[in-house]
């Protein structure tokens, strides 16, 4: 029986959704034990016969005992699975449940006397030594599962995790707050609520997106950070929307009241910035509203010196979630070493605060949670807190989601969910304690649903009774949490009623004192809002030179593999060609090899590289091969982990099939680690618009709004090659529309050596005031094009060139054609077949900032020039034409004719038929090269 007992101990204590089936099988077992599988025979025989599990019932027949046990099992399982539906988690306006499973003892034809005759072990094996009988154990379970915390965990597939949660929840435990801690907790709430009341009274109608109704969020965060400090976690990354943000800034990040009140008065808050440098607040030249701003606090207030960051955030709900995850991973990764980074999940943790309407409503949440257990993205478990005020602006839950709870969507990610009454502050603290213990044990996400209400409208100018009159009748009558908890402490004798009111008044006095320090006349005056001088120039070329032998040593190392490593023969032939630029006079470096050489030299310079995207390890077009696979064993080898004299890490991951969360993650990673060369590669550039929110609200505007620098690089495959409207265009026009104030660099290249120098220039700019995003319209067919490939001597010296020209005789040129990327190559190859010295092709490699000076200098050298043409593949209303036209119009003035050649205006980017594509493409080339 020893082995049999072990098997039972490892089996689930409850059968979840399979309980009905298991009970039917148990009936079959009673009739014929051989009718069920052997493992169930072991389990059922112990349930039926073993006194240590189920002792004989008093005064009943054995058959009745079996029936009674089955009913007890049903009751127990229902309480665990559905007790949350009757839990006391609603401070006000509890919902009316229409369909609640049976949860009472009487529902199962059981009574106290019967249950007292059954061992507590039948309820749960860990109850056997705690309670005298099943009745006592079930009372405990009812109190736990129907109390102020509602637990959902039976959906979790991992039995170890489920068992851990069951024991942690059901074992008698109470948050042991002594009287001093309770007083401190009351004071925290008084500060939280007092702050909101002061602003409400003194700045009537000003938007602040009050925390009132879910005030417990602040002490929950404080508890979380304190526990993290005890665990040695010294970097806390928080993401949240605007609801309650000002309160978190003041009471978690310790932003002085003077600074916050100054922002309401439109005076300069930076005059009150702590002189000790503990609070970092960046600001852009155009700025943002106060409830979008974040900050970084370095403090030992929570038990050890910690860095607590609240991420800047736009109004786009939930979009900050992947940014916070990326920032956390950056803090966890050690990148200043050769090889791959090492990740220590104990260095940092993410806390993401959601809204109850936005959490199930915004798909970015599901994309972000999907990153949780992936090697390239895991942060060791995120704490998710839903500030559930049970309304979204004016929309009530019945119109906001198709599920019972806003958190139901998280069940698919196998994480525990705790719903907690926001008015029961001690319960909210316990929920945090259990969540942090689970995270520490299993390194997985936990979701806490903080169920409260919204004291006022969506914003303080909004009247909620217009659309939600009935709920607000009850909310207005409902005491705030500082009074709910304060009165509880008065009743317990922890504080007196006078002490309660005295401290509430003291908070108002402190706020008034802070208010009085501010000079109302000290208004901010910055109407010009000029960008900083550091951004006056475009991305500067990196002029470092390399010897032939240096690059050859790197190349040889990248083509050297471990003994016994078996590369697919077909691939090996491709890789062996990378020796040719170094041992053949006519050898050329193609795009992929140029990238490998650039990456290797960047790693030697001490700049870490992180490259992610769908299929990025191989490359969508089978060109990169950064990760090699042994064709016999499947083992992998990454050559860029073995660069000679490597000083920083190379990290590459195939991403999940997601754009928004992955780009947000990489953006956040680079913001946190500005030395890191982060690159996101789209499978096709056409799919980049799935992350348009990140581009619009973070990447291209963050520095102007928040002073938040990023050097994230985007590789977006872009070219018209007959593959239809969804595999042709990275929507170049949209990036050029976002480009302003030297906020980025946008390129479409035609030379592998220029690509090499561009990557080095971007890497050199990182962690400087000149850093900015880089957008590369990367090639597809040009990856293997010999016109694009260049000899090695173009790599040993020189730098990035914003324009490239063919050789020409100045006095013979009558027409200049400006083109970019593949269009330039198509024109060049066509012109090579029918040479015409009167036509000069110019490759515009850098589109933004537009190379006006370089083009102007070139045109000035051409005395017989008559016409300047812009040629593009894209439709006239897309691509670069509408962007370049004002620049080129000024350059040609009335000296030359200006013409456009490209597709006509179209609603869709490209033709669907490949043959039609060829006809249109050839017509563009023919018309462009025609010399009138």
Curated annotation (Swiss-Prot):
It catalyses: N(6)-[(R)-lipoyl]-L-lysyl-[protein] + 2-oxoglutarate + H(+) = N(6)-[(R)-S(8)-succinyldihydrolipoyl]-L-lysyl-[protein] + CO2. Its cofactor is thiamine diphosphate. It comes from the Bacteria. Keywords: Glycolysis, Oxidoreductase, Thiamine pyrophosphate. GO terms for molecular function: oxoglutarate dehydrogenase (succinyl-transferring) activity; thiamine pyrophosphate binding. GO terms for biological process: glycolytic process; tricarboxylic acid cycle. Its EC number is 1.2.4.2. Changing residue 534 to D: In strain: 23, 3700, 3759, LIM1, LIM2 and LIM3. GO terms for cellular component: cytosol; oxoglutarate dehydrogenase complex. SMART domains: Transket_pyr (SM00861). E1 component of the 2-oxoglutarate dehydrogenase (OGDH) complex which catalyzes the decarboxylation of 2-oxoglutarate, the first step in the conversion of 2-oxoglutarate to succinyl-CoA and CO(2). PANTHER family: 2-OXOADIPATE DEHYDROGENASE COMPLEX COMPONENT E1, 2-OXOGLUTARATE DEHYDROGENASE. Homodimer. Part of the 2-oxoglutarate dehydrogenase (OGDH) complex composed of E1 (2-oxoglutarate dehydrogenase), E2 (dihydrolipoamide succinyltransferase) and E3 (dihydrolipoamide dehydrogenase); the complex contains multiple copies of the three enzymatic components (E1, E2 and E3). Belongs to the alpha-ketoglutarate dehydrogenase family. This is 2-oxoglutarate dehydrogenase E1 component. It comes from Staphylococcus aureus. The gene is odhA.
């Amino acid at each position: 029986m020893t082995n049999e007992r072990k098997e039972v101990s490892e089996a689930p204590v409850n059968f979840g959704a399979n309980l009905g089936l298991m009970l039917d099988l148990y009936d079959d077992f009673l009739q014929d034990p051989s009718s069920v599988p052997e493992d169930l025979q072991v389990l059922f025989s112990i349930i039926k016969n073993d006194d240590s599990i189920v002792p004989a019932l008093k005064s009943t027949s054995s058959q009745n005992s079996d029936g009674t046990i089955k009913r007890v099992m049903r009751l127990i399982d229902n309480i665990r699975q559905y007790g949350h539906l009757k839990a006391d988690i609603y401070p006000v306006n509890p919902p009316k449940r229409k369909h609640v499973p049976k949860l009472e003892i009487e529902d199962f034809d059981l009574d106290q006397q019967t249950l007292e005759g059954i061992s507590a072990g039948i309820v749960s094996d860990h109850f056997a030594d705690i309670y005298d009988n099943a009745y006592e154990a079930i009372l405990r379970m009812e109190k736990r599962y129907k109390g102020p915390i509602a637990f959902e965990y039976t959906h979790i597939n991992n039995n170890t995790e489920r068992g851990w949660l069951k024991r942690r929840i059901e074992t008698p435990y109470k948050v042991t707050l002594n009287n001093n801690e309770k007083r401190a907790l009351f004071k925290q709430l008084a500060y939280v609520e007092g702050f909101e009341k002061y602003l409400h009274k003194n700045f009537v109608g000003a938007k602040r997106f009050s925390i009132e109704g879910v005030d417990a969020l602040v002490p929950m965060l404080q508890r979380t950070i304190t526990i993290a400090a005890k665990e040695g976690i010294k970097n806390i990354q928080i993401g949240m929307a605007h609801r309650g943000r000002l309160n978190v800034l003041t009471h978690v990040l310790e932003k002085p009241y003077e600074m916050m009140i100054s922002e309401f008065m439109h005076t300069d808050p930076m005059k009150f910035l702590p002189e000790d440098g503990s609070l970092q607040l960046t600001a852009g030249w155009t700025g943002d509203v106060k409830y979008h701003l974040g900050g970084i606090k370095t403090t030992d207030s929570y038990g050890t010196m910690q860095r607590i960051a609240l991420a800047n955030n736009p109004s786009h709900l939930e979009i900050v979630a992947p940014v916070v995850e990326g920032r956390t991973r950056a803090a966890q990764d050690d990148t200043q070493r050769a090889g791959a980074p090492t990740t220590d999940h104990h260095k940092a943790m993410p806390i993401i605060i959601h809204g109850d309407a936005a959490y199930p409503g915004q798909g970015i949440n599901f994309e972000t949670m999907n990153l949780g257990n992936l090697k390239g993205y895991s942060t060791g478990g995120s704490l998710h807190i839903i500030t559930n005020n049970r309304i979204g602006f004016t929309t009530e839950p019945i119109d906001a989601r198709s599920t019972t709870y806003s958190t139901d969507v998280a069940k698919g990610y196998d994480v525990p969910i705790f719903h907690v009454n926001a008015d029961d502050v001690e319960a909210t603290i316990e929920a945090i304690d259990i969540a942090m213990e689970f995270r520490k044990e299993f390194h997985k996400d936990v979701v806490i649903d903080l169920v409260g209400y919204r004291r006022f409208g969506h914003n303080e100018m909004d009247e909620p009774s217009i659309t939600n009159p009935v709920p607000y009748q009850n909310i207005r009558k409902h005491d705030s949490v500082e009074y709910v908890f304060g009165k509880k402490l008065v009743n317990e004798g922890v504080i007196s009623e006078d002490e309660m009111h005295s401290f509430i008044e003291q908070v108002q006095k402190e706020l008034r004192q802070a208010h009085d320090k501010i000079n109302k006349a000290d208004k901010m005056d910055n109407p010009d809002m000029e960008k900083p001088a550091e951004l006056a120039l475009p991305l500067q070329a990196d002029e470092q030179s390399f010897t032939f032998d240096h690059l050859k040593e790197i190349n040889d190392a990248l083509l050297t593999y471990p003994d016994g490593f078996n590369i697919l023969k077909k691939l090996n032939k491709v890789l062996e060609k990378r020796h040719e630029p170094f041992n053949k006079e006519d050898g050329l470096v193609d795009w992929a090899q140029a990238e490998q050489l650039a990456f290797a030299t960047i790693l030697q310079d001490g700049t870490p590289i992180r490259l992610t995207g769908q299929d990025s390890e191989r490359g969508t077009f089978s060109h990169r091969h950064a990760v090699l696979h042994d064709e016999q064993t499947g083992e992998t080898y990454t050559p860029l982990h073995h660069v000679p004299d490597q000083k920083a890490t190379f990290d590459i991951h195939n991403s999940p099939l997601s754009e928004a969360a992955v780009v947000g993650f990489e953006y956040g990673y680079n913001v946190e680690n500005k030395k890191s060369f982060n690159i996101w590669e789209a499978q096709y550039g056409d799919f980049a618009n799935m992350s348009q929110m990140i581009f619009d609200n973070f990447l291209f505007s963050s520095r102007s709004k928040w002073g938040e620098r990023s050097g994230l690089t985007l590789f977006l495959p872009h070219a018209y090659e007959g593959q239809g409207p969804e595999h042709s265009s990275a929507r170049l026009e949209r990036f050029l529309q976002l480009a302003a104030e030297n906020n980025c660099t946008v390129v479409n290249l035609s030379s592998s050596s220029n690509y090499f120098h561009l990557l080095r220039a971007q890497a050199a700019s990182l962690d400087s005031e000149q850093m900015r995003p880089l957008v590369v319209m990367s090639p597809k067919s040009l990856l293997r094009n010999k016109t694009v490939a260049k000899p090695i001597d173009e790599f040993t010296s020189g730098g990035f060139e914003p324009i490239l020209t063919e050789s020409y005789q100045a006095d013979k040129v009558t027409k200049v054609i400006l083109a970019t990327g593949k269009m330039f190559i198509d024109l060049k190859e066509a012109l090579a077949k029918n040479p015409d010295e009167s036509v000069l092709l110019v490759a515009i490699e850098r589109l933004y900032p537009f190379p006006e000076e370089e083009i102007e200098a070139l045109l000035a050298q051409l005395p017989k020039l008559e016409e300047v043409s812009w040629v593009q593949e894209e439709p006239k209303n897309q691509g670069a034409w509408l962007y370049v036209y004002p620049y080129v119009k000024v350059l040609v003035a009335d000296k030359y004719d200006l013409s456009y050649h490209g597709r006509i205006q179209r609603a869709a980017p490209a033709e669907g038929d490949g043959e039609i594509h060829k006809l249109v493409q050839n017509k563009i080339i023919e018309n462009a090269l025609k010399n009138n």
